[in-house]
Amino acid sequence: MIYVENKDLVIPGEVLADDEYYSGRGTFKENGKICSSLMGLVSLRNKKIRVIPLKSKYVPKKGDVVIGKIKDVRFSMWDVDINSPYSGILPAFEVFGREKKELNKVFDVGDVLFLRVVDVDEVKKVKLGLKGRGMGKFRGGIIVDITPTKVPRLIGKKGSMINMIKDKTNCKIIVGQNGLVWVKGEEDMEQLTKDIIHMIEAEAHTSGLTNKVKNKLSLAIDGELPQEDDYSDDYEELEKPKLQNFKEELEQEEKEEQSKKDSTDFYKVIEELKKKNKKDKPLSYGNNSGNSYILNNR
């Protein structure tokens, strides 16, 4: 039995379903029930239930693009705040190669950069780099901070949401996977874009958000609502790829469980045969070919 619906807001400890469902991330099992371990939104797929956190900290991964702020300049590197519990470092050789320059003449404390995560070691030491299109120091503009888990909603399917905002406001917008967003344009458009971004963050779990954003932009810029278009909402599409291999995972788990069961059943049969043989002599059982297998009764 299921006690919640898809996209319901739940709190820690709330009962979600009976254990005929599969427990996913953000849930735990207790007394035959699946419960939420955090505050978030229910996601149901193929009898698997999980809870997507409303707020979470950014955990860096190799290859991520992030926005960071220089917080210290050292002898051979910069310390960078990447909006995460884990601090980043930008080594000088990632910028200069073998050249030697005074670091604070290139990037100083307070500078905001667009960077790539080059590596993350086992203790979460984050190495950053500047290789890639558009990487480097931002000049002007504002930084908007959102929950990292809402970044896919801001971008939209194939960039649909973020491109719509860019087109209407004529602002340059760069989104970091760590939840920091750089916006540059006319001052009033920067503020409008900031408001729109926070609206998307607050209503990321709702349906019809694309149309809401389009209407707000049109009212603010054109003074009227746009003509009605059939804008499909992209929320469901963003969730699908994460669970595409769920069936394969279940089949693999079932095979492993069956293998363990078969192995256990075999040894149970052998133990039963040993118990039935009360005389101190070997047990034997045969196969169709006439061969016998001997088990020492010890």
From Swiss-Prot:
Q: What does this protein do?
A: Non-catalytic component of the exosome, which is a complex involved in RNA degradation. Increases the RNA binding and the efficiency of RNA degradation. Confers strong poly(A) specificity to the exosome.
GO biological process terms, alphabetically, are:
CUT catabolic process; exonucleolytic trimming to generate mature 3'-end of 5.8S rRNA from tricistronic rRNA transcript (SSU-rRNA, 5.8S rRNA, LSU-rRNA); poly(A)-dependent snoRNA 3'-end processing; RNA catabolic process; U4 snRNA 3'-end processing
Q: Where is it localised? A: Cytoplasm
Q: How does it assemble?
A: Component of the archaeal exosome complex. Forms a trimer of Rrp4 and/or Csl4 subunits. The trimer associates with a hexameric ring-like arrangement composed of 3 Rrp41-Rrp42 heterodimers.
Query: Where does this protein have coiled-coil stretches?
Result: none
The cross-references to NCBIfam families, in alphabetical order and at most eight, read: PRK04163.1-1 (NF003181)
**Looking at the record's lineage, which domain of life comes first?**
Archaea
Which InterPro entries does the entry link to?
Exosome_RNA_bind1/RRP40/RRP4, KH_dom, KH_dom_type_1, KH_dom_type_1_sf, NA-bd_OB-fold, Rrp4, RRP4_N, RRP4_S1
- Family stated for the protein in its record: Belongs to the RRP4 family.
The Polar residues compositionally biased stretches are 285-298
Region Disordered: list its residue ranges: 276-298
* One GO cellular component term: cytoplasm
Q: Which UniProt keywords apply?
A: Cytoplasm, Exosome, RNA-binding
S1 motif domain mapped to chain residues:
63-131
Q: Which residues form the KH domain?
A: 139-197
Q: What is this protein called?
A: Exosome complex component Rrp4
Say yes or no: keyword Cell cycle present: no
Among the GO molecular function terms of this UniProt record, one is: poly(A) binding
| Gene3D superfamilies in UniProt | 2.40.50.100, K Homology domain, type 1, Nucleic acid-binding proteins
Q: Name one Pfam family in it.
A: KH_6
The organism encoding this protein is Methanobrevibacter smithii (strain ATCC 35061 / DSM 861 / OCM 144 / PS)
